[in-house]
Amino acid sequence: MARILILLLGGLVVLCAGHGVFMDKLSSKKLCADEECVYTISLARAQEDYNAPDCRFIDVKKGQQIYVYSKLVTENGAGEFWAGSVYGDHQDEMGIVGYFPSNLVKEQRVYQEATKEIPTTDIDFFCE
């Protein structure tokens, strides 16, 4: 009986680990360079370290370059967050996309202006 219980619990852990979680929205709108929000807006450099509080965010180290893909529209006194990715040491090594506070970085180069205001969706705040 104990063996069956252990197998069931192990299966439950595997099942839960294979599914993501929809987290609370940080904003209902975002600014992007294009309608699909896939083009890079800018390249920014981190001015200080940042430890991600949950899976929606990314860890950033001072001096790292971050490619910015969207900028959340600030609502109800919330902080301003941008979505971006820190790339690895190798050119083809793409990092995980996540949010970080905009006041943490300084934009180094703007590729395209973020002029398209798009509603955020649940998938924008999905965590695996």
Swiss-Prot record:
The keyword Signal applies. Highly expressed in cochlea. The keyword Signal applies. Pfam families: SH3_2 (PF07653). Disulfide bonds join 32-37, 55-127. Residues 39-110 form the SH3 domain. GO terms for biological process: cartilage condensation. It is found in: Secreted. Residues 1-18 form the signal peptide. Gene3D superfamilies: SH3 Domains. InterPro entries: OTOR (IPR042801), Otoraplin_SH3 (IPR035554), SH3-like_dom_sf (IPR036028), SH3_domain (IPR001452). Its main location: secreted. GO terms for cellular component: extracellular region; Golgi apparatus. Keywords: Disulfide bond, Secreted, SH3 domain, Signal. PROSITE patterns: SH3. Belongs to the MIA/OTOR family. This is Otoraplin. It comes from Mus musculus (Mouse). The lineage of its organism: Eukaryota, Metazoa, Chordata, Craniata, Vertebrata.
